[in-house]
Amino acid sequence: MSVPAQNKSLFLESKFGQFAVRSTETPKPGPDEILVKVEATALNPLDWKVQSWGLFVEKYPAVLGFDAAGTIAQVGADIPPSSFVVGDRVIAQGWYDATKQTTVGMFTQYVVVPYKFVAKIPASVSFEDAATIPSGVATSAFPLYNQNATAPSVKLTAPWLEGGRGKYAGKPFLVLAGASSMGQFVIQFARLAGFSPIITTASPHNASLLQALGATHVLDRNLPSDQLIAEATKIAGGQFEVVYDAVSVPETLPLGYALTAQGGSLVVVLPADELMEKAKEDGKSVHMAHGLFITPVNHDIGRTLLDALPSLLESGDIKPNPVEILPGGLNGVVGGLERLKDNKVSGVKLVVRPQETA
C-alpha cells in the first residue's frame, strides 16, 4: 500500500485554543508498531473537555481523538505475519500520556500505534460503525471485569472469558444514561453476563434501541429522582449490587449512589472524590472507570477483550453504536464537538472520515 509523504491532522493549537487542520510528515512505524490509514474516527465528550477545561494535555499543538478504524498501511519489522499484515481492517484507540502530558490522537489521516493494542474487525462491520467501538467497550468493560488486584473494578468475571457467559443470571443491573455510547456497551456486556433485569435510564425515544441491546426496562431519565428510585427498586426488588453511571454528572451521581446497595459497587466515568470518601463510611465501593488499553493495569483484560472482539462483532453479541457521519472530513470535527458540548447528541455516535478532508 502506497503511503503519502504528507498527512493531514486536526490540531488543537494551544491550551483552551482553537482547532486547525494542517499537513505534517506522515509518521513511520517502529519495530513493534503499525501505521493505520484512518478511514473513520469518532468524537467523544472528552475531546471537547480537553479543549474547554484544559484537561490532561500540557504540550501543544496536540492531536485529539480516541477512536478510529482503518486499514493497516505499514507494519513494523518485529511484528509476526500471523498477527497483522498490510491491508488488515482494524480498530485502534488514541491515548494521553499522564507523565508526558501529551496525546496520540485519532483526528488524523495516518496514525502509528503499538500492534498489541489493535484488534481486527470483520468485513461485516463498516469502518464508520467500528470507529464507535474502542473506547466504548474499554470504558464499559474494564471497571466491571478487570481482575487485576490494583484495578478500580467490580472484578466480575468477563462474559467473553470461560465461565463468564450468563454467570450472573437473575441478578439486577442498573445503567444510568443507557443511550450514551458507553451505556449502550454496558447494557450489552451485562446481557452477555446474564444480568436480569437490566434497568436503564434514557429519553423515551431511545427505549426501543436499548431494549434491542438487552435492557429489560427503560425509565424516563426526566422523571424526578425519588420516582426513579422507587421505580427501579420496585423492579429489582431492592437496591443494586452493581450500578454503572455512564455520564456521572451532578444530576445522576446521587441517584446512582442511592440505588447502590451496602456492599455494592457504583462505577463512575468522571472524578467523584467526595462520593468515594462517603462510600468508605457507608460500606459501598465507587470505582472510577479507566478505559485506556495502553494503561498497564488494563493490559491483561484488554488483551483478552481485543482477542475476543472479532468474534463478538461477527456473531452480533456486541453491536456498535448507531452513527451519524459528519461531512467535511476532519473539518467536520469542530461542529460535532460543539453539538456534544451543548448536549445535542442522543443515541448516536458522531463520526468523520479523515480521508475526505479537503
Model-derived features: positions:
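Eukaryotic N-terminal targeting leaders
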Residues: 1-19, 29-32, 54, 154-166, ...
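Glycine-rich beta-strand-centered segment in the early N-terminal region that forms part
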Residues: 2, 25-42, 52-99, 104-105, ...
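C-terminal hydrophobic helical "lid"/dimerization subdomain
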Residues: 2, 297-358
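Short, flexible surface segments
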Residues: 31, 83-86, 139, 169, ...
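Mid-domain Rossmann-like dinucleotide-binding core that forms the NAD(H)/NADP(H) cofactor-binding site
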Residues: 131-223
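Glycine-rich cofactor phosphate-binding loops and adjacent beta1-alpha1 units
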Residues: 161-169, 217-295
